């Protein structure tokens, strides 16, 4: 695939919003599964990486909103915080992928993920302290809420998202980010086979 069209990106964004509804429902049986695994984060981050910043932002805002309206999760009082947090994840991951060109896909993916995760958590934490929590939000509460309690989810996202992205690219469902690198790899593989 040479390039994703606006229609392609819109369809993928809608799919990721749907996953924001479905994935949390699958974790209902696990106590505090939503907190531990942060299931909405995965499709939003993936949407930002694949479709770009505007679509990632839309996915991050609509995901919690649609999920809350359809399933009651997140609860209505917490929904605005999640909309900001996830919107930032989608926006930042898309921006980093747009402007960072290291020459290596894995480096770009992990840089985008880490910067988006940190940026989203820091900005949302500041907003919670200044606006949503009225000055009663502490550093320890921020660290516990955004890093400690959701550590399994962070690890899963850092493992799965690059794997999914690379798999989609290799299946020709996404444009190849570095065609020259892929061509070189194919050439070396061909040479190896010819020498057998």
Predicted features by range, described:
Residues 2, 11-22, 59, 81-129, ...:
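Short helix-perturbing small/polar motifs within transmembrane alpha-helices
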Residues 1, 5, 9, 74-78, ...:
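Membrane-helix interfacial "entry" motifs
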Residues 142-156:
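Individual transmembrane alpha-helices with interfacial aromatic-anchor signatures
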Residues 41, 45, 83-90, 154, ...:
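Alpha-helical transmembrane segments of multi-pass membrane proteins
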Residues 2-50, 54-55:
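Hydrophobic transmembrane alpha-helices
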Residues 175-184:
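Short, highly charged, low-complexity non-transmembrane loops/tails of multi-pass membrane proteins
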Residues 185-192:
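Conserved small/polar residues in nucleotide/adenosyl-binding loops
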Residues 22-38, 62-96, 132-133, 141:
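Interfacial aromatic-anchored transmembrane helix boundaries in multi-pass membrane proteins
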């Amino acid at each position: 695939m040479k390039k994703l069209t606006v229609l392609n990106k819109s369809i993928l964004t809608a799919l990721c919003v749907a996953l924001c509804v479905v994935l949390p429902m699958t974790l209902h049986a696990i106590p505090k599964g939503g907190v531990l695994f942060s299931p909405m984060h995965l499709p939003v981050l993936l949407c930002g990486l694949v479709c770009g910043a505007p679509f990632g932002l839309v996915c991050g805002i609509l995901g919690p909103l649609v999920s809350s309206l359809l399933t009651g999760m997140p609860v209505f009082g917490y929904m605005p915080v999640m909309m900001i947090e996830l919107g930032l994840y989608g926006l930042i991951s898309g921006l980093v992928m747009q402007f960072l060109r290291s020459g290596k896909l894995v480096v770009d993916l992990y840089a985008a993920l880490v910067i988006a995760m940190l940026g989203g958590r820091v900005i949302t934490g500041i907003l919670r302290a200044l606006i949503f929590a009225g000055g009663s939000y502490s550093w320890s509460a921020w660290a516990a809420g955004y890093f400690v309690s959701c550590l399994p989810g962070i690890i899963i996202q850092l493992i799965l998202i690059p794997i999914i992205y690379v798999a989609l690219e290799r299946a020709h469902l996404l444009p190849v980010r570095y065609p020259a690198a892929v061509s070189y790899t194919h050439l070396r593989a061909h040479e190896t086979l010819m020498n057998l």
